Amino acid sequence: MKSNAICAIATAKGSSALGVIRISGDNLDSLLSHIFTKKLSDRRAVLTDIIANNIIYDNCIVILYSSPKSYTGEDVIEIITHGNPVIMHSIIELLCKNGVSNAAPGEFTERAFLNNKISLEKAEAVSDLISASDIQAVRAAQNSLNGKFYDEVNEVLSCIVSLRAQLESIINFPEDDDTPDLTAKKITEQVERITSLLENILINSKEGRTLNHKRTYAFIGKPNSGKSSIINCLLREDASIVTNIAGTTRDSIEYELSINNKIVTIVDTAGIRATQDKVEVEGIERSIKAVLKADKIFYVVDVSIGLDKDDHAILKNYNITNYDIVFNKIDLEGLESRVIQKSPTEIYLSAINNIGIDLIRDKVDEDFIQVEKVEDLYLARSRHVDHLIDAKECINRCPSHISDCKYDILAEDMRNAHVALSSILGQNPTEELLNEIFTSFCIGK
């Protein structure tokens, strides 16, 4: 178990009204009492100065959560400061001079796991909740954090353990009168229940996994088609340079955008055309890489030119399939009436007049999974789905073992399914797995 005291800023970077510094370790009150002008009281907010060498660092609210009733299971102190990064970093430096170390990413939650305050899949749910890209993903992560995923996996485990115990009894003590009366029919009924529970978890896990994917949309097309102008309208700011000179955008630029409470990444790319300009060629190559990574493409066309042979060549040569055609500059052709047309793969708009831009937002919104009963979902990770599939493959082999009366092989498949599901909950995890999970967290969590 780790016991050295650690600290980190728990709020986002930058200036804000308030900032939070989190500390965890053993005997924090005695370790740090000399830097507070007032005595800390367990689970009570104390208004106190932080002071050292007659220098007041800040007037703060400090809360002590004594072990074991804390997030990490150790003593935890949370310092609420004014949200100036200079103030917060100066307090971190003071703490480090007084026996506290800087926390690694995810180290607070890792300590919570190691101290049996939280299961591994709940620890992962903490990270998923922080990084959730829309409200449905938030709710699904909350379901996992509140134990829905754990409870359902644990229910299957309980059924497997029960059946394993019965099978082992028959295998090891066949002549014992106390062995359970386990017929093929009874075994089949239990296996069918396990299969049904697993299938339900797997369906919800796969759907929940899609919720946690932040979608990427790339805007591509020939130079001067208006890609950057459209993106500026979406962002409601002049984030991309816009001129009448073809080839202004020389690189792929990513932006984060909230559309109907869904966080997406949009990519502005260099215009694709034949050119000898080495810088522009590099930008075009990066545009193609953005296309390969994007979930969907908006192919932007100057409506006054139309979709010509060069556009068709670009779409074909770069194997662009999942795309919508965006006809821009309709104001130049008097085609404003086309905006109201509902085409599944075509959008007509005028970026310069901000007409039809909402059609882009609508298209993005349509791509997101619409879950009517998000309360049934949880944010499962790839490793969870892999373990569920492994367990289900073991269970799927059971009916043939039952019909052949191969109870020893049946028991072994049950054991392997047990191991797979236990891995989801973090029973006997490897150090490599823990490092992979917790290093993906932000500092301070």
Regions of interest found by a model, annotated:
Residues 2-9, 13, 135-258, 275-277, ...:
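C-terminal-of-GTPase-core extension/linker across diverse P-loop GTPases
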Residues 47-66, 247-275, 293:
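Switch I (G2) and immediately adjacent beta-strands of P-loop GTPase domains
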Residues 280-304:
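Inter-motif core of Ras-like GTPase G domains
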Residues 81-83, 234, 269, 294, ...:
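Glycine-rich, N-terminal phosphate-binding loop of Rossmann-like dinucleotide-binding domains
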Residues 266, 300, 326:
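Generic enzyme active-site microenvironment
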Residues 16, 43-46, 293-297, 320-323, ...:
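Short glycine-/polar-rich loops that comprise or flank the Walker A/P-loop
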Residues 1-139, 143, 147:
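A glycine-rich (often HGG/GG-containing) alpha/beta subdomain
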